[in-house]
Amino acid sequence: MRKRKKSVLLFLVLVLILSGCGTKSDVITITNVSYDPTREFYESYNTMFEEYYKKTYNKEVQVIQSHGGSGSQARSVVEGCNADVVTLALEHDISLIEKTGLVDAGWIKEFPKSSAPYTSTIVLLVRKGNPKQIHDWDDLTRKGVDVITPDPKSSGGACWNFLAALGYAKTKWSDENKQK
């Protein structure tokens, strides 16, 4: 975690230093602050967007990417990271930014049924040969089975993991205590 903070700080310092070098550029820069699993998607998408923008408006645009845990990224924006666009994993991460006035109130209503603009797939990984015979959510509750997932305070994916488990429990049990 310290290494990541130092890397981000070093990156920001370099950006500030280099932004004062050279002549005035006609290149428009956009900073997209996003969560880790979207890194490869946005590398590809940004290239297409930059080409589209150049062709459509005859101006160059460069998208700068910043990636980390969704919750950590939301806090960095709240604490001053200069984001032009945020693409985060969870509603509450964007709502945190909304409280600062950086995102318009009621942003969620722009989506059908106030839904999240992303989906997530949960995959259960097991040891080679599946020695504990794990096939479904029920199997994760057996003694001797451990679940490893990121911290939901900093990872949108971890929140989706917990929500997926809760969703499964709700289809199986109507008793809220059993669901927990």
Please give the residue ranges for each predicted region.
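C-terminal motif of bacterial Sec signal peptides marking the signal peptidase cleavage site
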Residues: 16-20
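Ligand-binding pocket segment of bilobal, Venus flytrap-like solute-binding proteins
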Residues: 173-180
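Helix-loop "lid/cap" segments that line or gate small-molecule binding pockets
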Residues: 164-171
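N-terminal segment of the mature folded domain
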Residues: 24-155
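Bacterial N-terminal signal peptides that target proteins for export
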Residues: 1-9
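Active-site cradle of extracellular carbohydrate-active enzymes
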Residues: 158-162
